[in-house]
Amino acid sequence: MRLLYFAWLRAKIGTAEEELALPSQVDDVNGLLNWLKSRGPGYAEALKDLKTVRVAVNQDYVGPEHKIRDSDEVAIFPPVTGG
C-alpha cells in the first residue's frame, strides 16, 4: 500500500509517503489508522484525534468503514477549508 501524508501530519510522522504491506487483520480505513498509531510516537501523535484527519483512497474521499487493499493509494490529511 502506498501511504501519503500531508501538512502537519507529514511533519509529525516524519515522511511524505511510504510503501507498506498491510497486516492481515487490517481491512478498512479505521483499522489502518489504528494500526498506524501503533507504529511509533510520531504516528500516535499525528493520529491521536481521528476527527482531525481525512482520508482518500485512490483519490476518493472515504469514511472509516471503507474497505482497503494492499494495492490502494491512501492519502491522510487534515480537513480542507476554504477562504
Q: Residue spans of the language-model regions?
A:
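Ubiquitin-like/PB1-type beta-grasp interaction modules and other compact soluble beta-rich domains
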Residues: 1-82
